Amino acid sequence: MAIPKVTIKYLNGLLGIAPESQDGLLALVVLGATGAGETFKLGTPYKVYGPSSLVALGITEDNNARLVELVREFYSECDEGTPLYIVGIASGTMTSFCNKDTGKIVSLVESLKGELRGVMIANSAAAGEVKEGIAADVLSAAPIAQVAAEHCANVLYAPIFVILEGRGYQSSASLQDLSEKTYNRVGIVIGDTKADSDDAAIGILAGRIAASPIQRNIGAVLDGPLTPVEMYLGNDTIDNSMDDVRTAHDKGYIIPRIHVGRSGYFYCDDPMACDPTDDYGHLTARRTIDKAARIAYDTLLDYLLSEIELNEDGTMQQPVVKSWQAAVESAINTQMTSRGELSATNGSGCRCIIDATQNVLATSTINVVLKVRPYGYAREIVCEIGFLTANV
């Protein structure tokens, strides 16, 4: 018999620590790219971790100048080591790429097993026909991209957002008003790092999104300015174009601006191409609700086709209802609230509601309502100022 002793065994997995997040995982799609033999095949997604990753793929400024430029922009805004998928497409339009049935956007999401959170689409070719202030292809792609993104969310259970490069900018006055649209999974960015350019600095935007937690507005001043030392709207600097910037912002475009007293450039806001009163009319709301949807799906999937203890009238027994609600709320609070991604009261940022009067025996359907508590954002701050005197 062994000598008497006390043995301590360390248990693991009790803290409920959430796994590493892929919230900022994006795909950068560049139309008009050139293949590089077996190392970089068009239509195939490649994961990179910095500009140096392009060397092994055979991607250079000589064969893919626009792609190299955008990857450099991306990593100027976020740390090297941040994963990014790049996809080169030989030719075509944004509209054709985003087509749910005949384009490549849905197959891209499928091929990456739903990992992607957003798809950023740029084009290295000429802007082509301009309509309502920017390239006609961009405007025609927006509703098509919305349909594809909704398909990914509703059918593939892989919700995404799509950002289109607002190419061929001509004037803010003639821009289509995106705030009148209903594309709450689509955004359009304008403004570039070069004067009189057909392009938009979508790599800068992608990097800022990837570097920001889901609840953080890309224009948050406390996060500091964007990296470019000069940014342009058409042929003039953003500094000299603030009237046009305001007009474009009011029409729902993602666009850089300046703040008096601060150096550098900041995004005005993070609008999607829809009515700003839409619950998901901002990228922060879109990313927040999509993450909650992914977590809820993964949690509830465990219960699919499981036996459910019922009452005599076919309704769920109360302990079962409570356990389901607790499981969903715990998953959301562990993976979101504890990260500061939801507004918390008493440690919880969500509420899961299951109507206990549902006749599950008759319908085999259980309706679940999940509500998460978002943050508010100070989009306007009004400060009244005057003199402090004995008369007041």
Give the role of each language-model region.
Residues L57, L70-E77, I295, T299, ...:
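Residues that form generic nucleotide/phosphate-binding pockets
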Residues E20-Q22, G166-R167, K194-D198, A356-I366:
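Short, ordered beta-strand-loop transition motifs
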